[in-house]
């Protein structure tokens, strides 16, 4: 039996990964992390979606220690989430240092427990938000270290790594879940479901991708299929 663990926030990217994983694996587990995030409404959204989509199990792990160590606008109410700035340089204040290091490591431990061969994460390098822990180089390096440390070949899969947001919408549509992802996921840094607040970087990236996809579905769908190998 093929098993996978999805790092699941209830947002657009991880929900799209879950939708695909449910088609590719016999048994899919979800793991969600409570780190005292500003947008912790995503935890309830993740619970609802994991149940609705048919995950075998959904575990919510308390990692609030991360909140004490990592200073970010997503972990401190005193630091405002900035509006989207197209020319912004450097690492944004929404970056939570160590978050994906911790999430992927704990997800791998959980995968070891449930005998899953893969950990799936929705990180993306094509139009990422300036986060160093979304890079392919980082994921591969951590995957190697974790596999060595556990003496087990647990594979980190990144199905969105080389597709952009428009193509991520196309992937959801390919599996017949465009409306679900559009209306029932929570991507917004300010914690608003669906289209979100419309001002933060996460909402802007999501909206621009959707508009691009809806404006030229055939072209974007074809590009997504070419990059992912889907037919």
Curated annotation (Swiss-Prot):
Cofactor(s) annotated in UniProt: Zn(2+)
Enzyme class: ligase
SUPFAM superfamilies: Adenine nucleotide alpha hydrolases-like
GO molecular function, a single term: zinc ion binding
Binding site for Zn(2+): 188, 197, 200, 203
Organism name: Escherichia coli (strain K12)
Record GO biological process: queuosine biosynthetic process
Assigned keywords, A-Z: ATP-binding, Ligase, Metal-binding, Nucleotide-binding, Queuosine biosynthesis, Zinc
Family according to the record: Belongs to the QueC family.
Record's cofactor remark: Binds 1 zinc ion per subunit.
UniProt: ATP binding residues: 8-18
Primary role: Catalyzes the ATP-dependent conversion of 7-carboxy-7-deazaguanine (CDG) to 7-cyano-7-deazaguanine (preQ(0)).
Name this polypeptide is given: 7-cyano-7-deazaguanine synthase
Pathway terms, separated by semicolons: Purine metabolism; 7-cyano-7-deazaguanine biosynthesis
Catalytic activity: 7-carboxy-7-deazaguanine + NH4(+) + ATP = 7-cyano-7-deazaguanine + ADP + phosphate + H2O + H(+)
EC number(s) stated in the UniProt entry for this protein: 6.3.4.20
């Amino acid at each position: 039996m093929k098993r996978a663990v999805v790092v699941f926030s209830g947002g657009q990217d991880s929900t799209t990964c879950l939708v695909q994983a449910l088609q590719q694996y016999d048994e899919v587990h979800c793991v969600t992390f409570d780190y005292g995030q500003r947008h912790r409404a995503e935890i309830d959204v993740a619970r609802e979606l994991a149940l609705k989509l048919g995950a075998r199990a959904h575990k919510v792990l308390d990692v609030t220690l991360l909140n004490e160590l990592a200073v970010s606008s997503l972990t401190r109410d005193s630091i405002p989430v900035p509006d989207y700035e197209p020319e912004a340089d450097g690492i944004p204040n929404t970056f939570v240092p160590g978050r994906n290091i911790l999430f992927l490591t704990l997800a791998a431990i959980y995968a070891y427990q449930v005998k899953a061969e893969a950990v799936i994460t929705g990180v993306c390098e094509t139009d990422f938000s300036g986060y160093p822990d979304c890079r392919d180089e980082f994921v591969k390096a951590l995957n190697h270290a974790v596999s060595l440390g556990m003496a087990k070949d647990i594979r980190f899969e990144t199905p969105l790594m080389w597709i952009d947001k428009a193509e991520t919408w196309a992937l959801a549509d390919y599996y017949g879940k465009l409306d679900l992802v559009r209306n029932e996921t929570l991507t917004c840094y300010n914690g608003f479901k669906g289209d979100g607040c419309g001002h933060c970087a996460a909402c802007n990236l999501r909206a621009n991708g959707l508009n691009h996809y809806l404006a030229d579905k055939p072209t974007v769908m074809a590009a997504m299929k070419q990059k992912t190998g889907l037919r």
